[in-house]
Design a protein with these regions (language model features):
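N-terminal Rossmann-like FAD-binding beta1-loop-alpha1 element of flavoenzymes
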Residues: 6-32
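Core beta-strand elements of the Rossmann-like FAD/NAD(P) dinucleotide-binding domain
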Residues: 4-6, 184-193
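Glycine-rich FAD pyrophosphate-binding loop
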Residues: 26-45
Length: 376
């Protein structure tokens, strides 16, 4: 069996692994990334492509998200990745939603967020697909960006190879890691630092560590339309009232329980499947819609059309576009550790697991990787 070496070995070429490779290589390290597929096929390519700082609470997590955003702007420009700094617009069609948004604005407008309250007519100007019937107003944020995750995850490896000399090894399964050795079918790699960024695959490497952590998996269902006619644009990425219940940025709002109570009473099926709805638009003009949240270690590979219909029904309460015909449906699975924003475990002197960003990988990975490569 051949032996090769690197300063840093990264297992997994999803966004977490690529971020670890980027910040390691930027520090002058010789880096190799080993990925089991010919290109990462997991949650990193099955999401909205949203860099979403507005969802993170003020403090360290918002700072991490904003650092990630800065890195995305730099990397996308250099790698030829389409990135749109289109911001986000959170719509409120009910008074309890408007109460939460106003409270959030009053307590967070000077906490690092770049936000403003907008009236219903301004919301319609910003996003022509907004439905104005019953619209109270919205929360406009300028920090959110959109990429096409399929393009980004495809182009980042070549960028890392060309600019930083990162060696990308695709179609290769890591079978074991012991001390400073990473074994594949035909090569044993030696590395001073090893980062395991295996996404939703908890079973192959260090399964006992994952089992002890209490980490689980989340399945989300998503859809994509065709290209919108006449170069129609959504404007800022959109969301509505249920999104206020999903993100940690809003959890301390004293007005949130009233919204939670109404949602459980009036929309029990949406709550059951963890549905809140986001709308993003990629560079081709296609709309990406979703999503739902089902949790467990053995999630069904079969999607529920009921969930897709619930998503589309709720979407129809606040948004419409020229062409809402669905061209693609899929699901993604990401790791989640309840009550935590990431799972970082030092399993040996050489090896660290970096995982479990709980659905915020596009938003937080570059910032987390910067922090970890500074201290490990």
């Amino acid at each position: 069996m051949k032996e090769k070496s690197a300063d840093v070995i990264v297992v997994g070429a999803g966004i977490v692994g690529l971020a670890m490779a980027y910040h390691s290589a930027k520090k002058g390290k010789k880096v190799v990334v080993i990925e089991r597929s010919q290109q990462a096929q997991g949650a990193s390519i099955r999401n909205f492509g949203l860099i979403w700082p507005i969802g993170q609470p003020s403090g360290p997590l918002l700072d991490r998200a904003l650092r990630s955003r800065s890195t995305w702007l730099e990397v996308a420009g250099e790698a030829g990745i389409w990135l749109h700094q289109n911001g986000s617009l959170q719509l409120a069609h009910h008074q309890d939603e408007w109460d939460v948004i106003n409270e959030f604005y009053s307590t967070n407008s000077h906490e690092g967020f770049q936000i403003e309250l907008v009236a219903a007519d301004k919301a319609k100007q910003l996003s022509p697909g907004t439905k104005t019937a019953g619209l109270k107003g919205g929360l406009l944020s300028s920090t959110e960006c959109t990429v096409d995750p399929r393009e980004a995850i495809s182009k980042l490896p070549g960028y890392l190879e060309k600019k930083y000399g990162v060696e990308m090894v695709f179609g290769t399964v890591v079978t074991s890691i012991e001390k400073d050795q990473v074994a594949t079918a035909d090569i044993t790699w030696r590395g001073e630092k090893i980062f395991v960024c295996s996404g939703a695959d908890f079973e192959t490497l260090f399964p006992e560590t994952f089992q002890q952590s209490g980490i689980t998996k989340c399945k989300l269902q998503m859809m994509r339309t065709g290209v919108q006619p006449h170069a129609w644009k959504v404007g800022p990425s959109l969301c509505a009232g249920l999104t206020l219940l999903h993100y940690g940025a809003f959890k301390d709002c004293k007005s949130l329980p009233a919204l939670q109570t109404r949602a459980q009473t009036d929309m029990p099926d949406l709550i059951k499947w963890g549905i809140h709805v986001l709308v993003s638009q990629n560079g081709n003009g296609e709309l990406v819609l979703g999503d739902s949240h089902e949790y467990g270690l053995s999630l069904s590979p079969f999607d529920r059309e009921e969930i897709n219909q619930l998503i589309m029904s709720y979407l129809g309460t606040f948004f419409e576009a020229h062409d809402m015909a669905i061209n693609e449906r899929w699901h993604g699975v990401y790791p989640k550790l309840e009550g935590k924003t990431e799972f970082v475990a030092r399993v040996s002197d050489h090896t660290t697991i970096v995982n479990g960003l709980s659905g915020a990988g596009m938003t937080l990975s570059f910032g987390l990787a910067e922090e970890l490569t500074n201290i490990l």
